Amino acid sequence: MLGIVKMEGHETTDWSNYYQDAQEGYSSVPVSNMPQGLATMNTYMTMNPMSSGSNITSGSFNMPYGNSGLGAGLSPSGMSGMGSAGAMNGMGSGVPSMGSALSPSNMNAIQSAQQASMNSLSYSSMNSGMSPMGYGATNINRTRDSKTFRRSYPHAKPPYSYISLITMAIQQAPSKMLTLSEIYQWIMDLFPYYRQNQQRWQNSIRHSLSFNDCFIKVSRSPDKPGKGSYWTLHPDSGNMFENGCYLRRQKRFKCEKTQGGKGNQDGRKDHSGPSSPLHRVHGKSSQMDSSSSMSNPSSSPQALEHNGSNGEMKPQVAAGPSPLSSHQNHSTHSLAHETHIHLKGDPHYSFNHPFSINNLMSSSEQQHKLDFKAYEQALQQYSSYGGGLQGMPLGSPSMTGRGTIEPSALEPTYYQGVYSRPVLNTS
């Protein structure tokens, strides 16, 4: 067992407080399983210089512990080739008492004796023991599985996009145009990877041809009969790839002519289409102009009212202006008259809708007033109408009298009483 063990300090300066003797680190440790020469090992501090010598091994001290990793070269039986007896005798008389002999001053003699003993060791006996792993070297050269986890290099997927493949195929053709089947065949001939799973990548090729503006579909000419149309590159696509490198495109090509043509066609449809709303408005205005030019401007009282609002216009119309100015005046009056009628509404139709702009934009005082008189009158009328409906003939005068709604129900105050809060709040 160990003797007294002293604690080490955190700093090297504190060690002098713990250890009185510089050579004292631990008490001497007797080792029972060592030979007689190494019966009493010295302290840890004195063994450090011995461990620094790289040539000193357990075999040099004849320490008989067996390790399979050391092999036969360093086993006790293999030490006979080293001349263990002669080597140990050459170490001097200090070997039997290693406790006093293993001091830093005597280590040089031990190292020189060890080097002399190691020189006599043959390399043939060290090969088996000094192997890199220390184990049997036959396990390193294991046979690999027959299954390959990677494709061979020629059958790897090429680093090109489908657009690059199509562009390469078209540019390699003498006529600069190919059919769909010819594009398929060119890709399969050049890249063996695409000889498998043909349906998948062929669908991708068709999609790339259809949804990219850089490819144009050309119909077959009569002198070239066959199936399928030709595909070629757009003349304005230019050099889509950087310096002929098909790994990456510079930018996506978009045909501006097709977009402009579509916009022009849409504009023509808007302007000249017979069913377009703009065409209808122009047609109505032209019809109104022709009808107003044929009629007399003084015949309509509304035109006179508008003329009366402007005092300067009255004498000009009465004095008989030129035909051109009168035609312009007639057209402006007719348009103003139509807009006035549209905004004013039908004079015979006196019903005011509850959601009209006049009721929605009413004053705040009228919004909070609740007039239930008209609402009660309407309820009484409808209740009496429903009660007397069963025993009355269809042609009775009371039936016709009840069928007409009194004017009180048509007033705006009736609906203002029903809807206590306005729908549109302008405050």
Curated annotation (Swiss-Prot):
Residues 256-272 have a biased composition (Basic and acidic residues). One of its GO terms (cellular component) is nucleus. One of its GO terms (molecular function) is DNA binding. Residues 285-302 have a biased composition (Low complexity). GO terms for biological process: anatomical structure morphogenesis; cell differentiation; regulation of DNA-templated transcription; regulation of transcription by RNA polymerase II. Present in the vegetal pole and marginal zone but not the animal pole of gastrulae and in equal levels in the dorsal and ventral halves of both gastrulae and neurulae. At neurula stage, expressed in the notochord. During tailbud stages, expressed in the foregut, brain, hypocord, neural floor plate and in two lines of cells just dorsal and ventral to the notochord. Expressed in the adult liver. Residues 157-251 bind DNA. Keywords: DNA-binding, Nucleus, Transcription, Transcription regulation. Residues 323-334 have a biased composition (Polar residues). SMART domains: FH (SM00339). This is Forkhead box protein A1-B.
